[in-house]
Amino acid sequence: NMTERHSDTCGQRHEHAHGKSKIEEALGKYDSAPSDDSVREAVKKIIAEKVQEKDTPEVKKCLMGSIELTTLKTTDSPESVMAFTERVNEFDNTYPDLPHIATVCVYPCFADVVSETLEVDGVEIACVSGSFPSSQAVIEVKVAETALAIKDGATEIDIVMSVGKFLSGDYESVADEIGELKEVCGDRKMKVILETGCLKTAENIKKASILAMYAGADYIKTSTGKLEPAATPEAAYVMCQAIKEYYDKTGIQIGFKPAGGINSV
């Protein structure tokens, strides 16, 4: 249960034993990340052995039904977002043999536009929040933006992990922020973007993945799409291995979302 897990972790996070915080203790329970070289080799092996096998219409339809159709442009306007959403409404007519996309993703100021325009059942409304894409804002601003997005119709929230704090080793502050924003989201799904291109190493990506899941993420996501490199097969491999290990230890299934720079299958 996500709520139980979250309240448990938040309630214990500042207790210390043997000089270690609860976050450090939690991270210590997981395997060390593989080396960057071994990750590259593992990815090469998967691509060589699995890509052709998985190149089927069924897999492609599954991927189509997992897409988060996104507009996060400086030039977005109520009119452009409305037209963007109408494309989703027309999808069945345009592509009758394909599954619907999963989600429409916009800035919080357009949540109400999508909510009022979207006519398709089963398509979620996601908003990036918490000072996307940099996550450089005080927590009160992040909380307010998230709460307002939900009030205006967001059914999912995408936040960005505080990468600077993470790289400085301030894991407790990073986890506290994620936990506080998950409290605002309640039972709505919250994705935590790790911005793996800034983390650079498999070790950092593994640690950030575990930290985000421990703190309350429902999904972990590679990138904002605003920086390069964005999603890579190597980052995806490390994150998915972390999700599997987390599930093996807790029984809690966390989702994975690759984002940024993906333009083919």
Report each predicted region and the residues it spans.
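Charged, compositionally biased N-terminal leader segments and the immediate start
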Residues: 3-67
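Short, intrinsically disordered, charge-balanced linker/junction segments flanking boundaries
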Residues: 13, 258-265
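Alpha/beta enzyme core
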Residues: 54-64, 75-99, 109-256, 265
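Structural signal for alpha-helical transmembrane segments and their membrane-water exit/capping regions
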Residues: 69-72
